[in-house]
Regions:
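N-terminal Rossmann-like NAD(P)+-binding subdomain of aldehyde/semialdehyde dehydrogenases
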Residues: 1-130
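Conserved small-residue-rich beta-alpha loop and adjacent elements
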Residues: 121-165
Length: 165
């Protein structure tokens, strides 16, 4: 089976048609093939992300937090399945995989409560005749390059904070 990309809520078959094997490190057995993206695929994904970011930037903070809590719940409900995938693909023990998920979930938990820090501030007369405003202004699309040896923890360190803010 070939594992393709997931873009904008659906499977995306990269134009490159190149793949690499996904091996179980304990047995050396090839379990799947992973599709590789090329520059044209990356350009497509960035364009789709930029379009999606426009709507996301206008999404109410409370709604983003609700989505983060739902994501948190899904991680909890499916942690054994995620751990099993880490064991199969990365060769970790089940306990190590669960620990990786737990460490990543700490950042998900933080992201669920980030709304208190994103409300903005106003300081009247911070200096003579100077008022200070702090505003949330979404910057745009971000990307994360994650190491193979922490396939759950590192993405959970990056993406929830980017999405919540």
């Amino acid at each position: 089976m070939t594992i393709n990309l997931w873009v904008s809520g659906e499977e995306y078959v990269p134009r490159s048609k190149r793949t690499i094997p996904v091996e179980n490190p304990a047995t050396g057995k090839v379990m799947d093939e992973l599709a590789l993206a090329d520059k044209s695929d990356l350009d497509h994904v960035v364009a789709v992300a930029r379009e999606a970011q426009k709507a996301w930037a206008r999404t109410a903070l409370a709604k983003r937090v609700d989505i983060m809590f739902k994501f948190r719940q899904l991680v909890i409900e499916h942690q054994d399945e995620i751990a099993d995938a880490i064991v199969r693909e990365g060769g970790k023990t089940h306990g190590d995989a669960l620990g990786e998920i737990a460490r990543g979930r700490e950042t998900v938990d933080f992201s669920c409560g980030i709304n208190a820090a994103l409300k903005g501030e106003f300081t009247d007369q911070a200096s003579t005749g100077v008022d200070v405003h702090t505003l949330r202004q979404p910057v745009g699309v971000v990307a994360g390059i994650c190491p193979f040896n922490f396939p759950a923890m590192v993405p959970m360190w990056m993406h929830p904070v980017a999405l919540a803010t």
